[in-house]
């Protein structure tokens, strides 16, 4: 009984200490928010480029003092909040100078060198959140770290910052895996690099070399999103991939890239493909718009026994060309009451939303 009572007392004491810590953190945050947030936001959105001295004066901040880590953690939180709400309006030069005034780079590098594992990971994520900086000399020790989360966070930050060979890890490790979250983060990094004027890599080499199916698919998607038309001839080799998913994504991308040379191959392989890939082929042919595939689309509709595939074919015909619309009308006149609804759905997409 005494042991149980002691355990309860210990739990209550821990809860009180935890609550007190949260209260203290909240109080510190509120104090910093009241003192800095509005002026930091105003400086960040000011179209005039301000000097370090001007910003320090407006913030009433003494740059000679050594800032405390707890204070700087809150400052980075405020910077993150400003960036997340006003990203497209920010004067990046002023935003970066605020970081100089508070010595944020020094703080982040010290967190990476001396902080706990959690602090290190948070610092790495912060660099991306606030477009901060840490030297490659500090980052390099974590790029091959045995801890997966720390290693990946360091690699993504390196990709964010480096102008050298930031994606070398995909060359070095063909078995490098990507989770869904990793793919989202990597795409955000690519968008950031494009925005700041860094070169976009050619993705096709990793489609060819990666041993991981989802990594191949990710880079095929990026080829499409970045319209890397020069990669189309090599990407066309993926039409022979054993994976249905890789094959389908390659077909979709080749259509969006308008790689017309692939159309005969798509028509040739159509009949032996699973239904999902057949639909991708039809959509790709619709994107290519060569005006040479009307006969194929007509026959494909006539032979299709899957309603989903029939609908994709009708949509392709309807949007293909003037001759495509005539072919659509011709098929509609022949339609029985059972299939007439497919034509109505194609001509009036709102029906899909109302049903």
Model-derived regions: residue spans:
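Hydrophobic alpha-helical transmembrane segments
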Residues: 1-3
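N-terminal topogenic membrane-targeting module
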Residues: 11-111
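Amphipathic alpha-helical scaffolding segments comprising HEAT/armadillo-like alpha-solenoid repeats
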Residues: 57, 66-69, 92, 98-112, ...
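Structural detector for internal amphipathic alpha-helices that build alpha-solenoid repeat scaffolds
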Residues: 88-99, 121-131, 152-163, 182-195, ...
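Alpha-helical segment of the N-proximal tetratricopeptide repeat
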Residues: 107-129
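Short inter-helical turns and helix N-cap capping residues of alpha-solenoid HEAT/ARM repeat scaffolds
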Residues: 115-116, 146-149, 177-182, 211-212, ...
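Alpha-helical oligomerization segments
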Residues: 326-330, 334-344, 349
């Amino acid at each position: 009984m005494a042991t149980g009572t002691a355990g309860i007392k210990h739990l209550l004491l821990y809860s009180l200490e935890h609550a007190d810590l949260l209260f203290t953190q909240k109080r510190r945050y509120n104090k910093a928010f009241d003192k800095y947030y509005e002026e930091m936001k105003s400086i960040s959105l000011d179209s005039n480029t301000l000097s370090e001295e001007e910003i320090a004066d407006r913030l009433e901040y003494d740059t000679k003092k050594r800032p405390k880590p707890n204070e700087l953690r809150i400052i980075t939180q405020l910077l993150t909040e400003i960036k997340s709400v006003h990203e497209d309006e920010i004067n990046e030069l002023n935003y970066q100078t605020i970081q100089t005034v508070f010595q944020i780079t020094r703080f982040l590098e010290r967190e990476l060198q001396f902080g706990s594992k959690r602090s290190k990971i948070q610092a790495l994520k912060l660099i991306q959140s606030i477009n901060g900086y840490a030297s490659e000399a500090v980052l390099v020790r974590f790029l091959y770290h045995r801890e997966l989360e720390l290693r990946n966070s360091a690699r993504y930050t390196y990709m964010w910052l480096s102008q050298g060979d930031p994606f070398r890890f995909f060359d070095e490790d063909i078995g490098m895996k990507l989770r869904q979250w990793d793919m989202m983060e990597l795409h955000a990094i690519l968008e950031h690099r494009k925005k700041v004027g860094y070169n976009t890599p050619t993705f096709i080499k990793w489609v060819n070399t990666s041993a991981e199916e989802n990594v191949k698919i990710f880079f095929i998607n990026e080829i499409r999103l970045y319209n890397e038309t020069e990669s189309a001839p090599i990407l066309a080799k993926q039409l022979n991939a054993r994976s249905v998913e890789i094959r389908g994504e390659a077909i979709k991308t080749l259509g969006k890239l308008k790689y017309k040379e692939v159309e005969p191959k798509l028509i040739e392989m159509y009949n032996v493909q699973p239904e999902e890939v057949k639909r991708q082929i039809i959509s790709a042919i619709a994107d290519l718009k060569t005006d040479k595939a009307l006969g194929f689309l007509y026959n494909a509709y006539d032979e299709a026994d899957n309603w989903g595939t029939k609908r994709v074919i009708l949509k392709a015909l309807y949007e293909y060309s003037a001759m495509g619309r005539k072919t659509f009308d011709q098929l509609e006149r022949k339609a029985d009451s059972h299939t007439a609804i497919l034509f109505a759905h194609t001509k009036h997409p709102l029906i899909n939303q109302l049903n």
